Regions:
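Electropositive phosphate-/nucleotide-binding environments in soluble metabolic enzymes
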Residues: 134, 214, 291
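C-terminal-of-GTPase-core extension/linker across diverse P-loop GTPases
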Residues: 204-220, 242
């Protein structure tokens, strides 16, 4: 006899823990992070009347494809009343940041143009791995700091990029602290020298800039590690490699101070298909394999599983399909049987 699995949906989670200010979906690419993000955003805006912002931090994912409207690089776009979508153009944001750095160098040193060597070095930083992460979490922190929405839903990059993005915040924070410490000592010497000369020390624009960077980093790290404000969900499918990847990712995220709120098991074939006449042997084997791994997920992760979402007969894109996905994600439909 098949038995019900105890994944009651995000509605139950929100009733028990309250609706957070921020929801983050993470996981390996192609498993349903973006679909989960878009479906939850649609549900919370339309059915729960929450002012909701859905933000993609994954350059490979596409909220534009799922919502069937172009958001890329267009800033904050209102899709529906109470539902806004942002898909950042990280390359353009990095280019804008580089332009700001050049402008500040010219202002600080009274230059008409940035010296050629420095200009080339700044341009070369766009190839640095940290630049994308920096641009992305900078955008995330700015959006949350503005406090324009009840709920922020972030679609994180795949595991490797997601972990690196979070780790980079800690690395940059330490780097900024070291530079600030050194710069503060220089500023103290400059102040003493100015006092001896009877002149007034000029404002240290470098320290001011470093302080701004540190503030943004702190906003980001505080945001994703605060369990009162943020719910962190991981999406996986019932396959061996997905389970192993999830284990590794959970370990890495724990080391970075991020606590899992729950798991969403996605793309699960309805077990009722086993009773369908004419079912192919291939499909039967796939369903049986999935049932095995669904059991393993529940045994291994226990009550961490908060929702089970089935495999749908067509691609989950467009508002009608997102509403269907949301019914399972929120737990409004019957749970998966194994």
């Amino acid at each position: 006899m098949a038995e019900l699995i105890g994944a009651e949906g995000l509605s139950t989670f929100f009733r028990q823990h309250g609706v957070p200010e921020i929801v983050i979906f993470a996981g390996k690419g192609g498993l349903g992070k973006t679909t989960s993000s878009a479906s939850l955003a649609f549900h919370m805006a339309v059915n729960e009347s929450k002012q909701t912002l859905c933000f993609s931090t994954d350059p490979q994912a596409s909220l534009s494809d799922i919502f069937e409207r172009d958001f890329y690089g267009k800033g904050d776009v209102e899709l529906l009343p109470r539902l806004h979508v942002v898909e950042i153009d990280a390359d353009r944001r990095v280019a804008d940041y580089q332009a700001q750095v050049k402008k500040k160098i010219m202002e600080m040193y009274g230059l008409d143009a940035v010296p050629k060597e420095i200009d080339e070095y700044i341009d070369s930083t766009s190839a640095e791995p940290a630049m994308y992460e920096s641009a992305t979490y900078d955008a995330m922190a700015e959006l949350v700091a503005q406090r324009n929405f009840d709920l922020y839903i972030f679609d994180m990059p795949p595991f490797g990029h997601g972990v690196r993005m979070v780790a980079m915040a800690d690395i940059l924070s330490r780097w900024v602290d070291k530079i600030t410490e050194a710069r503060t000592k220089v500023a103290e010497y400059e102040a003493v020298a100015a006092s001896l000369k009877g002149t007034k020390a000029t404002e240290d624009l470098v320290l001011k800039e470093l302080s701004g960077i540190r503030t943004k980093i702190k906003i980001f790290t505080d945001m994703i590690t605060d369990r009162q404000r943020t719910a962190f969900f991981m999406v996986l499918i019932p396959e061996r490699m997905a389970i192993l990847d999830t284990e590794r990712a959970l370990h890495m995220f724990r080391e970075l101070g991020i606590t899992l709120s729950g798991l969403v098991v996605n793309q699960v074939y309805p077990v009722e298909m086993l009773d369908a006449p004419g079912l192919s042997n291939f499909t039967r084997k796939r369903i049986e394999m999935q049932q095995h791994y669904v059991r393993q997920i529940h045994q291994q992760f226990g009550n961490a599983v908060v929702a089970t979402v089935p495999m749908f007969p067509r691609e989950p894109k467009g508002l009608e399909m997102l509403q269907e996905v949301a019914r399972y994600l929120m737990g409004e439909e019957a749970q998966q049987r194994v």
